[in-house]
Swiss-Prot record:
Residues 1-86, 284-304 are annotated as: Disordered. The keyword Cell inner membrane does not apply. It comes from Homo sapiens (Human). GO terms for cellular component: cytoplasm; cytosol; nucleoplasm; nucleus; perinuclear region of cytoplasm; plasma membrane; ubiquitin ligase complex. Part of a complex containing DCUN1D3, CUL3 and RBX1. Interacts (via the DCUN1 domain) with the unneddylated cullins: interacts with CUL1, CUL2, CUL3, CUL4A, CUL4B and CUL5; these interactions promote the cullin neddylation and the identity of the cullin dictates the affinity of the interaction. Interacts preferentially with CUL3; this interaction triggers the relocalization of CUL3 to the cell membrane where CUL3 is neddylated. Interacts (via DCUN1 domain) with RBX1. This is DCN1-like protein 3.
Length: 304
């Protein structure tokens, strides 16, 4: 920032003579006479004669030359800079309120206090949205960069400001492209990056699937989660490919699974799931049939 200071300079040359700023000759002096006064250029901003300079009156040219440029642009930039500086100070104070004593980051204990001040549960969907906007690399942790960049991304520098953004974040997450980005982020967010994990633990994956589909629960989700829960020995982890493809699965496969084809390029775990679910439904149907028919195949009304 800075102010532009200009100075008005009066022209030093005299007008009315071809000699310009040359020393006038004796012949010129004798012709003009001893009492002749050299014509002076009027100071900036004062009216003068009608002498033209490139088609403009000399007085007008001088006035235009000494006009100062408008400072509205500089003032606007200065005001914006001051506002940004104040916002950074508020963010610094907010970050320090929750950051760990030893590490320059908000860790589990600070995260609990942060969520408590936001009046949200650490395990609820709005916190996942916040982590998404902060592009947090690890659960239960916000680094300084993540916190500052995230707050700037949602234009908030206070607890009240963050709370005020939740409705718009919930609406944004309903957009198909935004939800896809959130969904893919959630897988990475669930990994333990410090351990170099490449797949989600089954229990973590189940919890995150329930969480990320909070606003849009596909019909097949409950069946899928039941399959994962009841087959713990056969499913050790969920790969990134399986996680990403499950979103496509929910969008193209109907709840009755009738349009699923093993010939398509689905993960093998989906083949196992569909086979397991169809067998479960068959057994369930047979059980209902047996109950309705009673002993020896007689209907209940025929047993009396």
């Amino acid at each position: 920032m800075g102010q532009c200071v200009t100075k008005c300079k009066n022209p030093s040359s005299t007008l009315g003579s071809k000699n310009g700023d040359r020393e006038p000759s004796n012949k010129s002096h004798s012709r003009r006479g001893a009492g002749h006064r050299e014509e002076q250029v009027p100071p900036c901003g004062k009216p003068g004669g009608d002498i033209l300079v490139n088609g403009t009156k000399k007085a007008e040219a001088a006035t235009e030359a000494c006009q100062l440029p408008t400072s509205s642009g500089d003032a606007g930039r200065e005001s914006k800079s001051n506002a940004e500086e104040s916002s950074l100070q508020r963010l610094e104070e907010l970050f320090r309120r929750y950051k760990d004593e030893r590490e320059d980051a908000i860790l589990e204990e600070g995260m609990e206090r942060f969520c408590n001040d936001l009046c949200v549960d650490p395990t609820e969907f709005r916190v996942l949205l916040l982590a998404w906007k902060f592009q947090a690399a690890t659960m239960c942790k916000f680094t300084r960069k993540e916190f500052f960049d995230g707050c700037k991304a949602i234009s908030a520098d206070s607890i009240d400001g963050i709370c005020a953004r939740f409705p718009s974040l919930l609406t944004e997450a309903k957009q198909e492209d935004k939800f896809k980005d959130l969904y893919r982020f959630t897988f990475q967010f669930g990994l333990d990056s410090e351990e170099g994990q490449r797949s989600l633990h089954r229990e973590i994956a189940i919890a995150l699937w329930k969480l990320v589909f909070t606003q849009n629960n596909p019909p097949v989700l409950d069946q899928w989660l039941n399959f994962l829960t009841e087959n713990p020995s056969g499913i050790k982890g969920i790969s990134r490919d399986t996680w990403n493809m499950f979103l496509n699965f929910t969008q193209v496969i109907g709840p009755d699974l009738s349009n699923y084809s093993e010939d398509e390029a689905w993960p093998s775990l989906f083949d196992t799931f569909v086979e397991w679910e169809m067998e479960r439904r068959k057994r369930e149907g047979e059980g209902r049939g047996a109950l309705s028919s009673g002993p020896e195949g007689l209907c209940p009304e025929e047993q009396t």
